[in-house]
């Protein structure tokens, strides 16, 4: 494919046009009075959204050079979304501001490499100041509600639900978002450890109305192989039957003679018993069995460890306060495992998460962590129409990620105030030359952009409000929702520090690349050679 080569100002100007096209479409969504963007699809109905990254992902420009600029800023939005879960619009606005100021100076003869060094120094100083500004959230329900509400575009109902979910499962817990069947939005919390395996036979059911099996204070046998013959199980069944307690068998599988005999014993009332398959596959199954063993104070019966069913004693079985099994899931509540052992296992899983490079593995480890340490909450999102459902679900996802980020790194004043306050530290940075000093100034001006955009979206003059907020100190800022100057933290207008930090770092990174671009290679689209139409087949032929 032939390439068109663009140099110098021509290359950078083309990239800038692309940056502006994408950023202008995204930034209308910023702030409490941000507008909606409607996205037409070639199939299905249009999507209405106020989510920056959703808008960014849909943008493809016709001019290939402009499209490269747009794709670079799209990368800012996507990466910010991946790392922090929110702040995509802020990141896009910052990138546009740095590119705009930077290209002015490059056109005036500044050295792009020195500008970039100045920008990097300024960003480092601002991030350090944001860390000083940050306040710890911990498990403060009110703060969690405020953060979630803001990220869900000032929807206090969603904020309340997410705060409730966090209160119930803790920061180690897993909160997932599902579509509700009706129009109500609500939280459903699963206490204890739940895994997606149901009873192996409906004859194990103890509650025919609900079609589930409930075992009170059962013994739990954990076995990593298949159980086919009853003879293997007898050494365990006899002492359990004498104790009068129920028994739950979790094994790779239970079939044949073993399963039919267990069912007969259950139906005769000789033994309260249920059997389920072990969760997961391969190595993950072994790890999850070990998790259940630690949670219930039992031992996994595994030949790898020198244990067989024949020499299993009742002391090797786990116990729990209650186990509920339906056709799809098993839930173990209040396992009798030692707190120290559970804590060590949690730390071990956290270490594996940090070392893992696979998103899938991390997600599975996070699920295991939640089942051990916290619990699982499902946030069901209800809406009257499919379009509203999609939009609401996007907002709930954003709010959830922002809340996690806040719990992780703390909160700062929202509404663009934290960045505006942080720019005061830039006066003390020593620049090695004039162009580096200009790079620092570029960031100093760019950090005003989020507040300016919020104000302009509210229909007011950005410069006036920015000047007034800059005169103030601490958390003094502008509440665009009520058109008042307030203490941002007291008014509940807060941002997760992680979101603000990641947005600035990603914006500066991509803007720096655009500023230091001297040449762009663009593919020349070849016109299709005028070939004849394909001949028609016989009628009715596919």
UniProtKB/Swiss-Prot annotation:
The keyword Phosphoprotein does not apply. It catalyses: ATP + H2O + a folded polypeptide = ADP + phosphate + an unfolded polypeptide. It is an enzyme of class 5 (isomerase). Belongs to the chaperonin (HSP60) family. Keywords: ATP-binding, Chaperone, Cytoplasm, Isomerase, Nucleotide-binding. Its EC number is 5.6.1.7. It comes from the Bacteria. GO terms for cellular component: cytoplasm. CDD domains: GroEL (cd03344). PROSITE patterns: CHAPERONINS_CPN60. GO terms for biological process: protein refolding. This is Chaperonin GroEL. GO terms for molecular function: ATP binding; ATP-dependent protein folding chaperone; isomerase activity; unfolded protein binding. Together with its co-chaperonin GroES, plays an essential role in assisting protein folding. The GroEL-GroES system forms a nano-cage that allows encapsulation of the non-native substrate proteins and provides a physical environment optimized to promote and accelerate protein folding. Its main location: cytoplasm. It comes from Flavobacterium psychrophilum (strain ATCC 49511 / DSM 21280 / CIP 103535 / JIP02/86). It is found in: Cytoplasm. ATP binds at residues 29-32, 50, 86-90, 415, 495. It holds the Pfam family Cpn60_TCP1. Forms a cylinder of 14 subunits composed of two heptameric rings stacked back-to-back. Interacts with the co-chaperonin GroES.
